[in-house]
A protein has these predicted regions:
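A short, Trp-centered hydrophobic/proline-enriched beta-strand micro-motif
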Residues: 6-20, 58-62
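Short, surface-exposed beta-edge/turn micro-motifs
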Residues: 11-13, 37-39, 55-58, 103-107, ...
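Short, well-ordered alpha-helical segments enriched in acidic and aromatic residues
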Residues: 25-27
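Conserved beta-strand in the GNAT
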Residues: 29-30, 70
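A short mixed-secondary-structure module that forms the rim of ligand-binding clefts
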Residues: 32-66
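Charged, gly/pro-rich active-site loop segments
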Residues: 67-129
Length: 129
């Protein structure tokens, strides 16, 4: 999981795919953090993507320096204060838009996750968590 998190942080902007009414939705994201041995991302509860993610399977795709990552798993919303604080401490630039416990700040962690690193000419590397 640490390798996945570090890769996504290096990439900076990754893309997350969800489904809405049977149609694919892909958007850029940039938050990723490990808290209590779980990989978290962050968004707003008022956004359509939150409804597409909460309790559902999503997939992240990221590419850097000839290596790409596909991370698939179920996203679980965590309404506790502690993971919200931790995420905002790692991304202080978000504090202007989100506050801990504001009813909009959403941190979601991956459950039953499978990450596969691919690179041309190399065997894929799979990590589950």
């Amino acid at each position: 999981m640490n390798e996945v998190c570090e890769f996504l942080k290096k990439v900076g902007v990754y893309y997350i795919a969800t489904v809405e009414d049977g149609e694919p939705r892909v958007r850029p994201f940039g938050t990723v953090n490990i808290f209590e041995n779980k990989l978290y991302i962050q968004t707003g509860k008022k956004k359509a993507c939150f409804k597409q993610m909460d309790g559902k399977v999503a997939e992240i795709c990221a590419f850097k320096d000839g290596t790409w990552l596909r991370l698939t798993g179920t996203l679980v919303n965590d309404d506790r204060v502690e993971p919200q604080e931790d995420m905002l401490n790692h991304y202080p630039e978000l504090k202007g838009m989100y506050k801990v416990g504001d009813g909009n700040n959403a941190v979601l962690y991956f459950k039953n996750a499978k990450a596969v690193f691919y690179s041309f000419g190399k065997e894929p590397k799979t990590i589950t968590f």
